[in-house]
């Protein structure tokens, strides 16, 4: 089954790549006034560079420009601090390894190829992780396959191929969830800690994934009788979590040193400086006078940067001019709100029926999906009231497997049994329409969810 899932995932990525290639060549590219990675005039484009730009150029738009800029120049502009480092830094180091081989490509082309190739590989791996996680929790091959199928053609599928961190985060979070959900009851702390650190370094919402090791470790202590090695396990789990948080704070310290300490003066290339002047961006190395967040008691830049540069905040996006973006996000948000509410309603009835210590343990043992649905419900609520509403589809599609489990419940055993005038049919139309339209629009630099 692993081979079958891998073939499905790879085929879906090749379809997206083909649609992007055709759309990028057939339609005129939109040129919005947004961030574009500044490129040195010293880079001479060879014919291979032009072929790569022609074939993959549609996969670098919007946030992809930021990730590729960080991969090449690190955090030279303050607005790039909205993007966490794991994905672009991995792309950077793999790109440097490829460049060391002596391939005659520009750095811009190498980074784009590496970014897309990395997402291809991680997508196939994450599809298999989703299949395995679903099988561990539900022991249902049909549901596991349908979940993987929907994942491969999810409504935000273009963002899992483009130079975005969605695929890396999906891979990291699914790996963490699978490690926490292992039925053996013994945690592999090194793997768990690595996956947790990857989640924290990949996306800001990775912080919520801390709840998984905490919940499943507490669940194990509750359901099992006290064992002689409980203290050792508690120590190991504590060190694992603190280690992952410590790695995240190493990144925070690096950013603080880069932007707030007066003795840090990066030697920026001239084209980076020129673009900063043109766009009125704050360059790193300005010292504590450069930005207000340097004076905060806890000088974490993320919230400030999101608020200052993107106007992200509680209900700030609720404006009439954003109605099209609300409509784009409506299918995902309404789907998730309803199914999470329905799950919690049934859970509340089960809790009410078993208000005893033994009944509580039974609930914890039987409702293994509770932390996943709670996580999904929190993310859905945050998307609804806080973030730019149009990112809800890709955020939820990459951050939680719950969407795929709920969707898989509506799917028939085979696609031959699929009827368009049914819930499964509506789901099929939604996923295929968003996949196709999203790929066409995104690859030509038009706004998309």
Curated annotation (Swiss-Prot):
Pathway: Glycolipid biosynthesis; glycosylphosphatidylinositol-anchor biosynthesis
TM spans (from-to): 8-28, 83-103, 110-130, 149-169, 197-217, 236-256, 369-389, 424-444
All ranges on the Cytoplasmic side of the membrane: 1-7, 104-109, 170-196, 257-368, 445-449
Keyword RNA-binding among UniProt keywords: no
Glycosylation sites: 44, 142
Gene Ontology MF term list: alpha-1,6-mannosyltransferase activity; glycolipid mannosyltransferase activity; mannosyltransferase activity
Biological role: Mannosyltransferase involved in glycosylphosphatidylinositol-anchor biosynthesis. Transfers the second mannose to the glycosylphosphatidylinositol during GPI precursor assembly. Required for the GPI-mediated endoplasmic reticulum exit and proper targeting to the cell surface of chp. Required for GPI-mediated membrane attachment of chp, qsm and Cont. Essential for microvillar stability in the rhabdomere.
Protein name per Swiss-Prot or TrEMBL: GPI mannosyltransferase 2
Gene from which the chain derives: PIG-V
């Amino acid at each position: 089954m692993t081979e079958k899932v891998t073939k499905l995932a790879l085929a879906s990525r090749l379809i997206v790549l083909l649609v992007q290639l055709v759309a990028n060549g057939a339609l005129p590219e939109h040129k919005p006034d947004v961030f574009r990675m500044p490129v040195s005039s010293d880079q001479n484009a060879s014919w291979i560079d032009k072929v790569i730009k022609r074939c993959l150029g549609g996969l670098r738009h919007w946030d992809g420009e930021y990730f590729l800029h960080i991969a090449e120049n690190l955090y030279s502009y303050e607005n790039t601090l909205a993007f966490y480092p794991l994905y672009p830094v991995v792309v950077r180091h793999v790109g440097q390894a490829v460049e060391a081989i002596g391939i005659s490509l520009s750095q811009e082309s190498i980074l784009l190829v590496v970014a897309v190739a990395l997402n291809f590989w991680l997508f196939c791996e994450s599809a298999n992780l989703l299949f395995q996680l679903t099988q561990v929790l539900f022991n249902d091959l049909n549901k596991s396959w349908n979940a993987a199928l929907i994942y491969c053609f999810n409504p935000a599928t273009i963002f899992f191929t483009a130079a975005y961190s969605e695929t890396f985060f999906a891979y990291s979070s699914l790996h963490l969830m699978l490690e926490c959900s292992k039925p053996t009851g013994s945690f592999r702390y090194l793997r768990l800690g690595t996956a947790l650190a990857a989640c924290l370094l990949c996306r800001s919402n990775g912080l919520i994934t801390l709840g998984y090791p905490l919940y499943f470790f507490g669940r194990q202590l509750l359901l099992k009788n006290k064992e002689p090695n409980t203290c050792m396990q508690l120590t190991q789990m504590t060190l694992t979590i603190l280690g992952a948080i410590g790695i995240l704070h190493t990144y925070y310290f690096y950013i603080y040193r880069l932007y707030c300490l007066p003795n840090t003066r990066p030697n920026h290339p001239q084209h980076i400086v020129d673009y900063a002047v043109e766009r009125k961006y704050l360059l790193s190395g300005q010292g504590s006078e450069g930005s207000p967040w340097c004076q905060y008691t806890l000088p974490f830049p993320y919230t400030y940067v999101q608020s200052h540069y993107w106007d992200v905040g509680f209900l700030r996006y609720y404006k009439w001019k954003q109605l099209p973006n609300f409509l784009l996000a409506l299918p995902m948000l309404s789907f998730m709100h309803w199914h999470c509410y329905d799950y919690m309603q049934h859970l509340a009835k089960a809790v009410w029926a078993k208000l005893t210590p033994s009944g509580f343990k039974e609930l914890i043992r039987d409702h293994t999906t509770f932390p996943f649905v709670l996580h999904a419900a929190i993310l859905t609520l945050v998307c609804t009231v806080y973030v730019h509403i149009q990112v809800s589809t890709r955020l939820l599609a990459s951050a939680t497997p719950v969407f795929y489990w709920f969707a898989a419940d509506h799917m028939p055993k085979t696609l031959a049994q699929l009827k368009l005038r049914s819930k499964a049919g509506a789901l099929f139309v939604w996923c295929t329409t968003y996949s196709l339209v999203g790929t066409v629009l995104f690859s030509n630099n038009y706004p998309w969810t």
